[in-house]
A protein has these predicted regions:
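Cell wall/extracellular polymer interaction/catalysis modules
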Residues: 8-139, 143-150, 154
């Protein structure tokens, strides 16, 4: 029996990994990596962060935002189930106002603080939009690592 290429379906995906390095009362500091290369740092609320694990990212219009945002979909969550309380990747400076497991992107300045957030957010969004236009599935993996366990390159 001969099989044609039509019998196989390949899913192309982009995998984003966030290595959480430091858990303090000022926030959860992490490093965002794509294809083995550090893209930026992350910061999350010290208590209201997502559990480590696998998620998907989709661009969705959120009612209280002026543009489509990269939202973080929990396992089995459909895009049409997204609401204003859905966690997302976003620009910002510090984590204390974050709710719902949102993640701020930027350059680490101190524990619990990132700078140049809008610049890093825009760069990552452009990269995610390109992947989305190519119909790539965007996966997010969050791993809890201590600073001693993560490669010095990150």
């Amino acid at each position: 029996m001969a099989l044609s290429i039509n019998h196989f379906y390949f899913t192309i995906f982009m995998e984003i990994i966030i290595y959480r390095r430091r858990f303090t009362r000022w926030g959860v500091d992490g490093t965002l990596v794509i294809k083995g290369t550090k893209v930026c740092n992350t910061i999350e609320h010290p208590e209201r962060f997502l559990p480590a694990g696998d998620y998907e990212i989709a661009f969705v219009s959120i009612a209280n935002k002026s543009r489509k945002m990269p939202v973080i979909l929990r396992k089995g969550q459909a895009v049409w189930e997204v609401g204003i309380n859905t966690p997302c990747l976003k620009p910002g400076n510090g984590p204390m106002t974050l709710e719902n497991g949102c993640i701020i992107l930027g350059k680490a300045a101190a524990t619990g603080l990132v700078i140049h957030s809008q610049e890093y957010f825009d760069r990552l969004c452009e990269r995610l939009r390109k992947a989305s236009k190519k119909k790539e599935c965007i996966k997010l993996r969050i791993i809890d690592w201590g600073s001693d366990e993560i490669s010095i390159a990150f």
